[in-house]
């Protein structure tokens, strides 16, 4: 996966922008950065696109800025000259693709049919725009195309909204979405940059929700610390007497059902620990680290195949240590 594709995967949503005035480029970039989405696809639908890309790329190096609606080699050349870090086209034009490849600039052409996908694959492309997304069948069509073309990663654009974004992002073959809803023409013309920033923040909330759902976070068990094995056994027997929970002994604890663990010693956490299951523990760890949470890597344990099995957060919550657990 290229650096640009890594950025797409990280950002999840690329604001699609139509600017009528080049002077709006700088305040727009500031609004997007403030909202936590430092990216923009500046469409070549207006005469100021090249200048807008140049302004953003030169003054805001942290922005992942590219050109959209690129219909010709000359437009691609102008965009790259202005500092575009990627090119997006509504359809597949072989000459534009080859020019971008020669220049070493990623291009994501629009493909909505099996024939177009095969042509793109023949050109060495595996990340494609699906445009217009909703009008071309939306997620149902993307799922159908992903069956024979499992290696393709999609960037649906056109009809993507805050309301259907989560559904698109939940599909594993969708690397990111293009969203024009983030940057409304009326807000740009009115200089309503706060509205754009707020839409970015609301989008990030949706992205986080989609990511958390994809990990499938759930409580697997709660562990309670005891001072010794005899005390742990007494607690396990009391749970059996009360509720009929049969205890299963392990070298370090008693499990009263799969959800309650009675430790034979004072283990992690002031009071005990909570195991949070995840479909991909390593990816969940990376996701939480990206949000500022720290893990104690010395507690990490691994499965025989090398995958992360469990690792503890450094922070306690309500006296309990928390660890991720691979489902």
Model-derived features with residue positions:
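Catalytic cores of alpha/beta
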Residues: 28, 72-82, 115-123, 160-176
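Core segments of cupin and vicinal oxygen chelate
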Residues: 28-30, 45-47, 217, 223-261, ...
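Glycine-rich phosphate-binding active-site loops on the catalytic face of alpha/beta enzymes
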Residues: 90-96, 129-139, 173-195
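Vicinal oxygen chelate
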Residues: 213-215, 259-264, 289-327
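N-terminal beta-strand motif that seeds the catalytic metal site of vicinal oxygen chelate
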Residues: 4-18, 208-236, 269-276
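Catalytic beta/alpha-barrel core
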Residues: 16-18, 39-46, 63-71, 84-92, ...
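Glycine-enriched alpha-helix->loop->beta-strand junction motifs that scaffold or abut catalytic
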Residues: 33-38, 59-63, 81-87, 102-108, ...
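Conserved N-terminal beta1-alpha1 strand-loop-helix module at the mouth
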Residues: 1-74, 78-82, 102, 162, ...
């Amino acid at each position: 996966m290229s650096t640009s594709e890594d950025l797409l995967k990280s950002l999840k949503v690329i604001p699609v922008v139509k600017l009528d005035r080049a002077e709006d480029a700088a305040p727009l970039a500031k609004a997007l950065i403030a909202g936590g989405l430092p990216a923009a696809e500046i469409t070549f639908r207006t005469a100021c696109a090249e200048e807008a890309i140049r302004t953003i790329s030169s003054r805001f190096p942290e922005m992942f800025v590219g050109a959209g609606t690129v219909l010709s080699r000359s437009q691609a050349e102008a965009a790259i000259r202005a500092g575009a870090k990627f090119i997006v086209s509504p359809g597949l034009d072989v000459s534009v693709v080859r020019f971008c490849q020669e220049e070493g600039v990623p291009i994501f052409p629009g493909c909505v049919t099996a024939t177009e996908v095969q042509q793109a694959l023949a050109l060495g492309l595996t990340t494609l725009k699906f445009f217009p997304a909703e009008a071309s069948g939306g997620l149902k069509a993307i799922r159908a195309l992903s069956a024979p073309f499992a290696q393709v990663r999609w960037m649906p654009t056109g009809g993507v909204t805050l309301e259907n974004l989560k559904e698109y992002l939940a599909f594993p073959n969708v690397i990111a979405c293009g969203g024009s809803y983030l940057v409304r023409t009326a807000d740009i013309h009115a200089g309503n940059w706060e509205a754009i920033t707020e839409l970015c923040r609301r989008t990030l909330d949706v992205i986080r929700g989609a990511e958390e759902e994809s990990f499938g976070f759930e409580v697997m068990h709660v562990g309670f610390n005891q001072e010794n094995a005899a005390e742990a056994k007494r607690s396990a027997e009391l749970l059996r007497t009360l509720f009929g929970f049969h205890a299963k002994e392990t070298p370090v604890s008693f499990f009263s059902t799969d959800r309650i663990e009675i430790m034979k010693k004072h283990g992690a956490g002031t009071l005990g620990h909570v195991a949070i299951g995840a479909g991909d523990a390593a990816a969940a760890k990376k996701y939480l680290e990206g949000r500022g949470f720290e893990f104690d890597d010395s507690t990490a344990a691994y499965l025989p195949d090398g995958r992360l099995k469990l690792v503890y957060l450094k922070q306690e919550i309500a006296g309990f240590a928390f660890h991720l657990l691979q489902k």
